[in-house]
Amino acid sequence: AHSRRNEKASLKNIFDLCEFFVNLHVISKPMPVKKKKSVDLSTQPIGVFDSGIGGLTVANAIQKVLPHESLVYFGDTAHLPYGDKSPDSIKYYSIRIAQFLMQKNCKMIVIACNTASSIAFETVKDFVGGKIPVVDVISPVVEIVTHNKNIHKVGVIGTKGTIKSDIYAKKIKAASKKEVASLATPLLAPMIEEGFFNNKISRSVIASYL
């Protein structure tokens, strides 16, 4: 009975996390399986990954909303930035990371990377095979934009991979009649990774793009 209560409490935390991401859709649904011994989800961590340290902002937000949850963060600094990598490479890296997080017994995977979310989300979902939920960072932005009646024009900046995928424009236009303008900003990710943000250099780079 205690294990069942812990499982229910942990599942509530997962739903709270999804609500925090603004009605984020949990794409992966558990596949029908034979009944097994119940697992205490409260002891399993939430896996978060990004191409570098940028996803730590997502991990930090999760910890604020779910302070009792443990996290496993994977920053793939060996291959950053993902934005200039081929789709096949990004899918390969994402699968390897998902495999690592599953080996760490994570009960959920959060793809805290726009490039990986736009290119490898379906690949990761297929690899996981419905064993655990997989969520991305694109869906909540689309939800906010499409449901806000005061937003009529949307500007999207991102890595070359994210912009080339056109994922934001496709999803926003599919759910609304809003105008979308996209711009690749390949210098932003490495600049942030190197610690150049909120200073003269970062402001100059941003100004040159805008």
Spell out what each predicted region is.
Residues 1-9, 14-28:
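Short, low-complexity, charge-dense intrinsically disordered segments
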Residues 32-210:
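Non-catalytic structural scaffold of enzyme domains
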